[in-house]
Amino acid sequence: MEYWFRYGVTEIPIEVSEEISCEKISLYRGFEVDYKILSEIAGEVGRKSGEVTILYDHEHQTQLELLRSLLYEIQSQTSLEGRVKIIFSSWRTSPRIVEEILKSSLKGFSCKIEYVEDCKKTSYTGLKTPVDVLESDTRILVTSILPHGLYRYPSIVNSLIYSKLIEKEEDVDVHSILEDKLQILGLCIVGEKTYLDSLTNLDKSSIIEAEKIYTVNLEPVDILIADAWGWPWDSTLESTLHILRLVYKGVREDGMIGLIAECKEGIGRREFAEKLFKIYEENIQDSYIEIVREVLRNRRVGMVTTLPRTLLENTLHIKSFDTPQEFLKYSLRIYSKNARIRIVNGPILIE
């Protein structure tokens, strides 16, 4: 039986003999734009003459489709020229990659695009926020919710903080400021649906819905092979390691996890790379390194990746492979052909 994994911008296969017990779970989901919701927003923008600021916290491709559809809908009702500015960030993947994606995907729209770290910011009732947010008539957040190994299901407000679209300077009620004073409207994808609401209501309803969609209870198997969702999530080692915590409960103690992640852009941020190379020289504290340590206490981990084998094996004790087939051959030598195997595609949190 042949199975496929997302790997960068492409897919790579694995062949599992029918003699071996193997099951597959996939939570890649389709997405249909809710134009009724987008028309409602566009109508609101059309009734006003001031500027529009869209805060965009990038997480996945369907979210980009939602942003494009929103801009099309606004453009069909009013001119975008000089009115719309997109302030973007992403704490999940490289902002440089997100910038390339946005500029390529939004070429046909007359809107400004700026990375949040390059924005002029100011203090406002205990928060530090881009000046454009304060000066706009309409403020929209385009976001989504997927499971993450560090935070399970991060709230929308916490995601804004992680991505530095807002920064807390004082101990204040962030929800109240964003909703009552700044009146930021939230447009959020969860699974196949789009939700439009206040940030407070979205935080409650969207996390509950995401948990229903992406959290599953599964019996542990001997070998679990999971992709890291493809580009841009698997662009660096740093951005993929959280997957281990999402899936490790689906593997028995002393079992083995295979993570399929291209890591085309290398290790990740310089700060993370420095910690990785000093991992045995001093008491390194890093959330992603701790995930690996936690999983390796009673499980084996291998990676199919372009990263050098010696890098992974000498720092994190993760064995590296060139193909999923090579990983499978190695793991079956350890667990035999009687091993139970699980293939995992897409965002999933195994309990």
Report residues per predicted region.
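N-terminal amphipathic/basic leader segments beginning at the initiator methionine
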Residues: M1-I37
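Short N-terminal or domain-adjacent regulatory/targeting segments
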Residues: C22-K48, Y72, S205-T215
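Short acidic-hydrophobic, aromatic-tinged amphipathic segments that line or gate anion-handling sites
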Residues: G30-I37, K112-D118, I318-F327
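A general structural motif
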Residues: V33-I37, L202-L218, S235-H242, N283-Q285
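N-terminal active-site beta-alpha-beta segment that forms phosphate/nucleotide-binding
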Residues: I37-S104, I225, E238-E274
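C-terminal non-catalytic interaction/assembly regions of soluble proteins
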Residues: S76-S79, R83-F88, T240-L241, R245-E351
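A glycine-rich helix N-cap at a beta->alpha junction
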Residues: V98-K121, Y280-E282, S287-N298
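Conserved, well-structured core segments that form the ligand-binding/active-site neighborhood
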Residues: G108-P220, I225-W229
